[in-house]
A protein has these predicted regions:
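Amphipathic terminal alpha-helices
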Residues: 289-323
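Substrate-positioning beta->alpha
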Residues: 140, 166-171, 187-209, 215-219
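N-terminal Rossmann NAD(P)H-binding glycine-rich loop of SDR-like oxidoreductase domains
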Residues: 3-23
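Substrate-binding strand-loop-helix patch
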Residues: 163-165, 190-200, 218-238, 247-258, ...
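Terminal hydrophobic/aromatic helix or amphipathic segment near a protein terminus
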Residues: 236-284
């Protein structure tokens, strides 16, 4: 089976290629923006923008579209270019190459609301309002894929962590080191979240590539929701990092984040705001996924969430020499 993967120089894409490079039944080809990479030499890697994808001399059986902007902050134009237009370019490539199976790596952020949500199913109502431009752009990309005439499916994974991650744990741990974390206090229902290790997500991407009859969409997670504040506290204790001292109510934090976003957007200021409304929502409200379809078609996850967390923490200790 020939698999073409976009976003090959990114966190998830590079992990997928390294994870399955020794599979004799797979021929892996990756497309990424970076000219330099640390991928195994047996991976056919092309440093190519997706607008030039038609120049690629490959006829894949499966295309996994994992490229895109994952940062929680950016302009609508940034997300349109990186998440919507790139999907359109990948679809055009697939049409030119005989309609291979297409797997879009979307996000559970399409469901996000400033409210508690439990066991969200794939057919849940989405939009018209979104908590982030990121979630909005991912849903726009999904709409394009739904119109593709070949085999296709959409993955909506939860938050992903692991070696190479720069968006989930690193910013939190960096803020904790500086004593900048704030605890968001919800007195009624504690925030919960689904998280999963990157290797587990990659396993499910490969299972989807091989599965005979795909559904239109799958929620993807480890199936072990965590209480967000308690989980973060446990991680910080294991790394001997300070726990949050200051507390804010979600409504106050949302107002602060909204003001900061306005300042960053209209002044404009460099970089990202220290907090965003999307981030406040993640740590203030419960958001868990129903993964019945994933389990029925692809089976249970290999490994456990707890062991994956411990593996990541050991990697973090090694990289930061914190113990």
């Amino acid at each position: 089976m020939k698999i073409l993967l976009t976003g090959a120089s990114g966190f998830i894409g590079s992990t997928f290629l390294r994870r399955f490079v020794d599979r004799a039944d797979l021929e892996l080809c990756g497309v990424g923006r970076r000219t330099e990479n640390d991928l195994p030499p047996t991976v056919r890697y092309h440093a190519l923008s997706l607008e030039r994808l038609a120049e690629l001399d490959v006829m894949p059986d499966v295309v996994i579209h994992a490229a895109g902007r994952t940062s929680p902050w950016g302009t609508p134009q940034d997300y349109e270019r990186d998440n919507v237009e790139t999907t359109r370019q990948v679809i055009d490539f697939c049409i030119q190459r005989g309609f291979p199976r297409l797997i879009l790596l979307s996000s559970s952020a399409v469901y996000a609301r400033f409210a508690h949500q439990f066991n969200v199913r794939e057919n849940a109502e989405i939009g018209p309002q979104f908590t982030s431009e990121y979630g909005h752009s991912k849903y726009q990309a999904e709409t394009l894929v739904k119109a593709y005439c070949g085999e296709k499916t959409i993955f909506r994974p939860c938050a992903v962590f692991g070696e190479g991650d720069r968006l989930l744990f690193p910013p939190l741990l960096s803020a904790a080191k500086k004593g900048q974390l704030v605890r968001l206090r919800n007195d009624v229902t504690p925030a919960q979240a689904d998280i999963m290790p990157v290797g587990m997500l990659c396993d499910y991407l490969l299972r989807a590539a091989c599965y005979p009859q795909l559904r239109s969409c799958y929620n993807i997670s480890a199936g072990q929701p965590v209480e967000t504040a308690a989980f973060l506290d446990d991680v910080l204790r294991q790394l001997d990092l300070p726990l949050p001292v200051k507390t804010l109510r979600p409504c106050t934090a949302l107002r602060v984040a909204g003001t900061l976003e306005w300042l960053w957007r209209w002044l404009p200021l460099a970089g990202e705001p220290p907090i965003t409304r999307f981030g406040v929502g993640v740590f203030s409200y419960a958001a868990t996924l129903d993964i019945t379809a994933m389990r029925e078609d692809f089976g249970a996850p290999d490994g456990t969430l707890s062991q994956s967390v411990q593996d990541f923490l050991q990697h973090y200790r090694t990289m930061n020499a914190c113990c």
